[in-house]
Amino acid sequence: MLKRRPVEVLFTFNANASRMAISSITLAELLHGAEKSSRVSENLAAIEDFYSRLEVLPYGTKAAQHDGAIRAALEKLGQPIGVNEMHIAAHARSEGLVLVTNNIGEFARVPAL
């Protein structure tokens, strides 16, 4: 979304922004990336424009419970995923939401996501 491509995805986002949300974990990842970039102010402004049109969902107890269950299940299978990916997956699953991502490899391992 932030890179505004592909154009088809941007149109879909703009048409459906009122029905979309972002995890506070995802927002933290985006802000971290902006702060490390060579164009901090420009990237922070783009991120603010992006998330200002979305509901930012706080990570709470329900998400933490899903996180523990997902982590244990994936460890038993010997297929752990990254810490932030774990938090994001747990958050989406705990809210019964559809997760939109380019990182299919890790998120596809999460049961019932």
Whereabouts are the PLM-identified features?
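Flexible glycine-rich beta->alpha loop in the catalytic core of nucleotide-sugar glycosyltransferases
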Residues: 7, 98, 105
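Short, solvent-exposed loop/turn segments at secondary-structure junctions
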Residues: 27-29, 63-64, 105-106
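Short catalytic/metal-binding and nucleic-acid-binding patches
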Residues: 19-22, 26, 33-36, 54-62
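Short, well-structured N-terminal submotif of metal-dependent ribonuclease cores
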Residues: 1-22, 32-49, 76
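Nucleotide phosphate-binding site architecture
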Residues: 2-3, 28-31, 57, 108
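A beta-strand edge to alpha-helix "cap/lid" segment located at domain peripheries
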Residues: 81, 106-109
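Active-site neighborhoods of divalent-metal-dependent phosphate/nucleic-acid chemistry enzymes
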Residues: 45, 54-102
